Amino acid sequence: MTVDFHSHNFPKAIAARAIAGMCKITEGRLWAVGDGTLENHLDHMELAGVDKAVMCPIATKPSQHAVILRTARAIMDGELGERAARMIVPFVSAHPGDPDVLAHLREIAAAGIKGVKFHPYYQNFSLADPEVWPMFRAIADLGLVVQCHAGFDVGYPDRFDACGPNEIGVLLKNVHGLTFVAAHLGGCAGFAPHATDVLLECGAFIDTSALHRDWHKDEEIRLLRCWPTERLLFGTDFPWVHYPEAIRWVKSIRDPRDHEAVFGGNAARLLGL
């Protein structure tokens, strides 16, 4: 089984606008595969032999909780089609500025959703801020998985202060029992060499969604090659990467004996698949 632990798609009504907006913000350094819709995402998965994908929405304001949760439930209940129910594992997003965030997290867990996506730059918070730790403690207590942007973001070229390896380390040293997946190879590329040690010591998982990043490529290859197999998850950041290319890249670097765990076994364990 192949599981993409980091993917995105958008409702049909806003997909074209969302894709165009991201391309504009990044001044053409990101380009999309396909049209950004759920159906197109499923088509690309089928063509590449990807069995399941974790869908990672981002709540950029507290009021988006309801619509994101409603979409996740619609996928799980089959309202958006049999393929989506079978192939998509919908995460939701929580916003640290939501005054009802703890109640909303309980609602998320009660709905059977497996995890929560965060992007500290888009959501304007730092993982190292003690004010957000109660939210993450609640997530840990509820048994939910965190999928979080890590390190540099092309849309925020001057920001390195909210979700780098050091901030992740501070969070996990203060919030015990949290299953934390740091995207983009943990965001370690471009930081000091000891950044890798920080994430290893705090027990973070990382995903492989770094192929669309042309900077620090040698360092990314080193990270992908050396990271412990049991804490590495195949992820793409689709639609910003072509599935066959992402699969080839990981397979060309990791030992074939690791492929089963990296491409699906570890994800199945975290998600209870």
Where are these regions (language model features)?
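Conserved, mostly hydrophobic/aromatic
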Residues: H6, M45, I108, V116, ...
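Active-site gating/metal-coordination segments in enzymes
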Residues: D51-K52, T60-V154, D158-R159, D214
